[in-house]
Amino acid sequence: MANDSMKKELVAHKVYSAWQFITYTEKNIGTVQYCADTINNIIGKMTMKTVRWQQDIFADFVDDITENGKKVKRVSVTTENSPVFEVRVAGEKVDPWFLFDKLLRDFFQYTMNAFDSMSQIINAGLLANKGKKVDSVDIQKMITTFNQQTYSTAFPKMQMWLNKIAQSQEFQYIEAINNRTKHTADIANKLSMGILGSSNTTEIGPFFRKDVQHDKIELSDQLQATLDFLNNSWNEFLTVFQEEYVKDAYTENRKHSISGVHQQKLKGEPDQDLSYAYISADTTFDAMPEELYILLVNESENGVYAHECPFDTILVTGTNKENILGRYCADDVIGDDCLLHYRKYVKDKTVTGDICSK
């Protein structure tokens, strides 16, 4: 559902800044899948190594006789002839237990990142002009925000989805294990290879956090359960999001372009050169909105291109672009960044007319 058609719809509804977070969510989900696949590949390679070691060790059986005269075959397993496990990353030997532990932590961290990215989509695509600062947004922030009557009334389906996620045991486990391993300490996970008839052991260890006991669980079961939960949640989210953003609840006074940039050069007087970005008014300056939200977007057959609006001041002109009526001033500062947002401009009522260009 996250395709070029949806991208164009976001442009039409003036919430295009949400698209960057849609692609980032999919990137996070892809990373989660990669972690799971690589963990399984590590276990598979270690298992294969163990099987081959056992085949080799069986060739070393020696004949022996027990005390009661029974003929037997014996084999000796020591640290010197035990299997050696290692994997290569970028040509370097890496301890598989280290890689297993890192990838397992990454698996849950990127799962949480995916849900936080979904919250950024909500912030940019639904809250829009009422959105929170991007650096303060995460899934818990959106859960709290959408439990407020204003937003639960405006977007009831999204509120239901958020509460469903918050109340899910699967999400609560993901959040708990991520916070434990990210901020507190390791968990006693187990990865051991069975030899001579015994089975492999692959477990996520038990842990106790915020008065809740989380029991040990078979690794493969939890990996698959988390993947299923994440993918199902994402599909449900996209359905709900598409039903909600078309309401255009908080997208007033958004623009994807300005009228142009006027440049005026005076021959022999370079210090008097004049250049300014402007918007042509269809009405009086007084009748224009108090705020504008601008993201420069160009839609063509080759795709959609967007850029932050770099102008700190935008003048308002009449039908003649040299007839200056007033100005808007940027309400926030932008830096050198790839993040896109609808930059807020506030009407400056302190000056009007040509003095605005000074």
Predicted feature residues:
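Acidic, Ser/Thr/Gly/Pro-rich intrinsically disordered interaction regions
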Residues: M1-Q109, S119-K358
